[in-house]
């Protein structure tokens, strides 16, 4: 297992075996994750919030850097496959995106990274910040989806992976700057949320198209998994719905929560200056 995770002897087939072996653990981990965060939330109810500024800044910096590297190591291969074999080939056939020792390894790392990313929620709970359904739901589900799709060759996931990498590079960088009290306009957060919805829409399109090619056109030899596609379609459509609701609440309704908060903070700073 460790030779695949560390990349010392990476092979796509070997990495798939690791993912297959982790599937059952991931399902149990999701249940344990939900129980843990709500147990911690109850424990913290009458206790003072932890500051955790330094470890949080380090965490956000690590995830932003990791995500940027993941994008840089996968995107050139994605462009190469599109130029050589066409756009649909990326989500309908196993290509060097998955088998290449660099791109393939970083796609595998993305799959594995969904496990440590669960720590995001621990920071939220221990700092007594609002814990919304959208947050813990997507953390609980994504890891299992990633492992199933990876070892069953449901390669539509590549459009989740590389877009998620670049979005997370900006998102965790944004969190880091916010934690450091750097003033950032709400439009940046809005752009990140918009890009996440675009990511879901593109991945849903890839799933629908490869399913059409498989069932309607009867194309043989596709990298298609009914289970991976079913889990993915359920996951991505529910994410898309939740993110739309979040977008409306925070950026559109009554001026948008984030924009109103920014205005209030600007007024407070003006009063202090006077």
From Swiss-Prot:
Disruption phenotype: Loss of function induces an egg-laying defect from the second day of adulthood with progeny arrested at the larval stage L1. The small larvae maintain morphological integrity and survive for up to 3 to 4 days. Animals had reduced levels of isoheptadecanoate (C17iso) and isopentadecanoate (C15iso). The phenotype could be fully suppressed by feeding with C17iso and partially suppressed by feeding with C15iso.
An example Gene Ontology molecular-function term: fatty acid elongase activity
Signal peptide (UniProt feature, chain positions): none
UniProt xrefs under InterPro entries: ELO_fam
Pathway: Lipid metabolism; fatty acid biosynthesis
GO CC annotation: endoplasmic reticulum membrane
Enzyme Commission no: 2.3.1.-
UniProt membrane topology term: Multi-pass membrane protein
Keywords from the UniProt entry: Fatty acid biosynthesis, Fatty acid metabolism, Lipid biosynthesis, Lipid metabolism, Membrane, Transferase, Transmembrane, Transmembrane helix
GO process terms (BP): fatty acid elongation, monounsaturated fatty acid; fatty acid elongation, polyunsaturated fatty acid; fatty acid elongation, saturated fatty acid; methyl-branched fatty acid biosynthetic process; sphingolipid biosynthetic process; very long-chain fatty acid biosynthetic process
PANTHER family given in the database record: ELONGATION OF LONG CHAIN FATTY ACIDS PROTEIN 5 (PTHR11157:SF29), FATTY ACID ACYL TRANSFERASE-RELATED (PTHR11157)
Function: Catalyzes the first and rate-limiting reaction of the four reactions that constitute the long-chain fatty acids elongation cycle. Uses malonyl-CoA to add 2 carbons per cycle to the chain of long-chain fatty acids. Condensing enzyme required for the formation of isopentadecanoate (C15iso) and isoheptadecanoate (C17iso), both play critical roles in animal development and growth.
Name this protein carries in UniProt: Long chain fatty acid elongase 5
Gene name per UniProt: elo-5
């Amino acid at each position: 297992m460790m030779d695949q995770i560390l990349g010392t002897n990476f092979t796509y087939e070997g990495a798939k075996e690791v993912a297959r072996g982790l599937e059952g653990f991931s399902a149990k981990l999701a249940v344990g994750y939900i129980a843990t965060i709500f147990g911690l939330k109850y424990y913290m109810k009458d206790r003072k919030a932890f500051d955790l500024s330094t470890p949080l800044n380090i965490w956000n910096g690590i995830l932003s850097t990791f995500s940027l590297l993941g994008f840089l190591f996968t995107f050139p291969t994605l462009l190469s496959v599109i130029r050589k074999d066409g756009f649909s080939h990326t989500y309908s056939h196993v290509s060097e995106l998955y088998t290449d020792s660099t791109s393939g390894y970083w796609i595998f790392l993305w799959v594995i990274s969904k496990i440590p990313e669960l720590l995001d929620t621990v920071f939220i709970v221990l700092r007594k910040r609002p814990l919304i359904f959208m947050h813990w739901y997507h953390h609980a589900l994504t890891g299992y989806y990633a492992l199933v799709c990876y070892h069953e060759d449901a390669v539509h996931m590549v459009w989740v992976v590389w877009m998620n990498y670049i979005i997370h590079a900006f998102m965790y960088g944004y969190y880091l700057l916010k934690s450091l009290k750097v003033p950032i306009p709400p439009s940046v957060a809005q752009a990140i949320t918009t890009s996440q919805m675009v990511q879901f829409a593109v991945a849903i399109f890839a799933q629908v198209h490869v399913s059409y090619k498989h069932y309607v056109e009867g194309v043989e030899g596709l990298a298609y998994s009914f289970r991976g596609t079913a889990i993915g379609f359920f996951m991505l459509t529910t994410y898309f719905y939740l993110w739309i609701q979040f977008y409306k609440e925070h950026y559109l309704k009554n001026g948008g929560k984030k924009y109103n908060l920014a205005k209030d903070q600007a007024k407070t700073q003006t009063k202090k200056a006077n």
